[in-house]
Amino acid sequence: MKLLFAGSECAPFFKTGGLGDVMGALPKTIAKTTDNDVRVVLPFFTGMAEEYKSQLSFVTSFYVKVGWRDQYCGVLKLEMDNVTYYFIDNLYYFDRPGLYGYYDEGERWAFFQQAIIEMLEKIGFIPDILHVNDYHTAFIPFLLKEKYGWINAYQSIKTVLTIHNLQFQGEYGREVLGELFNLDASYYDDGTVRFDTAVNFMKTGILYADKVNTVSPTYASEIQTEAFGQGLDEILRMHNWKLRGILNGIDYERNNPATDKNLVANYSAKKLKGKVKDKLALQKEFGLPQRKDVPVIAMVSRLTAQKGFQLVVSEMQNLVQFDVQVIVLGTGDANFEHDFRYFADTYPDKVGAAITFDVGLAQRIYAGADMFLMPSAFEPCGLSQMISMRYGTLPIVHQIGGLQDSVQPFNPVTGEGTGFGFHDFSGFYMMQEIQEALRLYAESVAWTKVVKQAMSQDFSWETASQEYLNMYNELV
């Protein structure tokens, strides 16, 4: 089977979030565990690290018609981990300091999507499955059928759309059909690509893709409701026959406390002593009193309302009344950044805040903390709770989306569970679960049992990739 993954970001080349993690891990795992021909196509963001740039080779170049303009498109190639990566090169669109957030986003992704389709014949690779991800590539299934459907070689291509976050849909004015895609406005006027008063890439992808999936089973159910559907719930209910949820995995090689080079001491579920050393080192790194006995509650995240930080801010005064230490790593909303700097200054023995993002420090936090707080308002999948369990740090989560699918709340009667969860999105219920975690922490034998249960969970990509392969096989 010939597979082509299309997306806007991919670890380790460039990433801003979970999409980059999935694009990095899923193709690599399929290539490692099967004999499928696996390839990935990405924009060539010029900020890519030199170690990868130096491995690029030139494949071909051509021009893509974006409205009345002929835009240069170079195709570069890199092979790594049995995966062939193609990079679409255009300095006008992709030679910028960041990945997203520019005035011409619609034009950038219009060029990218048309370039991907036009590239296929030129490189001599016609995939059986073209797997697109989020709105940046969600228009491809529509374009394949309506703009490029006359090309015989393309007619057998099946498409899969993965929704990583439904909040971002790619909404642009009616004029983009003619000005960017050279298509008739009738596709807008008859409602095919329109949602409300805009061309909507995501909605169109849901209509035209052969299969649609989200990154957790619960999120697949949630987005069919008005509360989580971001306006597209009715469309998703109409097409739920082709919708499913597949829980993301995490990279077990990179996220391994027994071998992680970022840690002061390595450890495993059988030998947990090293985790105490990592805790003491983490306390020292954040300027907190070095105490083995005090529970450390950590957060590693973008500081946004989606991640539930309004609950943390509202309850911080109550939280610091307990004998705990709180550690925060992340950047985001300026108000939240200010709040956590204030808490760290006001409670220097209780709160440590690093308003930055540092991958190595994140790994040391996963290892050195006792609890990982993740009170997201909504969470399509979430990877941090899986990583924290892998490192024996018990998650305290709002039970929605992928958090509900991956964290088994502690049952005090049976002693089973891998973390703690609350259903109502409020500071009061969050604090109740934190106190439940603190009570268990005081019982060291029971706590260690739950830590080992959490560390024994299987969130590897080998498990997740098999579900994707099953979906592909249904189409081919």
UniProtKB/Swiss-Prot annotation:
> Any idea what job this protein has?
Synthesizes alpha-1,4-glucan chains using ADP-glucose.
UniProt-listed Enzyme Commission number(s): 2.4.1.21
| Residues reported to bind ADP-alpha-D-glucose | 15
User: What is this protein identified as?
Assistant: Glycogen synthase
Q: Name one GO molecular function term.
A: alpha-1,4-glucan glucosyltransferase (UDP-glucose donor) activity
What the record says about family reads: Belongs to the glycosyltransferase 1 family. Bacterial/plant glycogen synthase subfamily.
Please write the reaction equations for the catalytic activity of this protein: [(1->4)-alpha-D-glucosyl](n) + ADP-alpha-D-glucose = [(1->4)-alpha-D-glucosyl](n+1) + ADP + H(+)
Domain of life the protein comes from:
Bacteria
Q: Which NCBIfam families match?
A: glgA (TIGR02095), PRK00654.1-1 (NF001898)
Kindly give the InterPro entries that the UniProt entry links to this protein: Glyco_trans_1 (IPR001296), GS/SS (IPR011835), Starch_synth_cat_dom (IPR013534)
Keyword vocabulary terms for this entry: Glycogen biosynthesis, Glycosyltransferase, Transferase
Per the record, the gene is: glgA
Q: Name one GO biological process term.
A: glycogen biosynthetic process
Its UniProt pathway annotation is:
Glycan biosynthesis; glycogen biosynthesis
